[in-house]
């Protein structure tokens, strides 16, 4: 790899107006956010969520003085802000560094079986599965782990799988300055497995193809890679 990498800017609240940050979330597959989504700090969000979750547990009939659950509202609030939904905080966007493709590798690069942990925005229960991504370099490459980090960043927010698939594809296009990107996600939805129909065997597959991957032969090659 080249010794003079090109850094792709990472969003920072100090550098961007709220309108700029919201624009980051509002691509073709936008995350539904209200206009004041970034006014509270993470600590303020934790405090507010903990208060509301205490009320939820109390309404359900739980005794919040019990040793086992007295700290549950705060634990849940921290988990929501710092882990489960950390993809809603722009500062958590992965910092991407581009490197020159010194080896002039011109074939398809595939990263498969990337772990996906997300949350269904309809019932707030887990989505878990695998993402498979591929691209053709136009002269720049990024570290392989950055593909995993991009998938994780967009997964860590309330999601529908279709939007997640498009958001990951768009992020890879931006990071690599290429339109030749493919993303397939195969995931299990706990809203299907644990409630309603209670089907524990089904999974949902979504795909987004662009550029060279619109060619049937190229797409076939990619699908053969991820099935092998």
Summary of predicted features, one role per range:
Residues 2-228:
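A domain-level signal for the structural core that forms small-molecule/cofactor-binding pockets
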């Amino acid at each position: 790899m080249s010794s003079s990498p090109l850094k792709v800017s990472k969003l920072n609240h100090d550098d961007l107006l709220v309108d700029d940050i919201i624009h980051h979330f509002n691509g073709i597959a936008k995350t539904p956010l209200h206009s004041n989504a970034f006014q509270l700090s993470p600590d303020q969000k934790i405090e507010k969520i903990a208060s509301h979750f205490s009320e939820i547990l109390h309404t359900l009939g739980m005794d919040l003085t019990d040793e086992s659950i007295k700290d549950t509202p705060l634990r849940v609030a921290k988990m929501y802000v710092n882990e489960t939904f950390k993809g809603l905080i722009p500062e958590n966007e992965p910092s991407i560094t581009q490197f020159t493709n010194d080896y002039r590798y011109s074939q398809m690069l595939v990263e498969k079986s990337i772990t996906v942990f997300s949350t269904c925005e309809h019932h707030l229960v887990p989505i878990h599965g695998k993402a498979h991504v591929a691209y053709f370099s136009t002269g720049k490459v990024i570290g392989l782990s950055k593909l995993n980090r991009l998938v994780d960043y967009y997964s860590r927010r309330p999601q529908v799988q279709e939007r997640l698939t498009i958001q990951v594809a768009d992020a890879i296009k931006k990071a690599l300055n290429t339109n030749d990107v493919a993303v397939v996600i195969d995931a299990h939805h706990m809203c299907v497995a644990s409630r309603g129909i209670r089907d524990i065997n089904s999974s949902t597959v979504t795909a987004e193809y662009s550029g060279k991957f619109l060619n049937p032969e190229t797409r076939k090659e990619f699908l053969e890679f991820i099935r092998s």
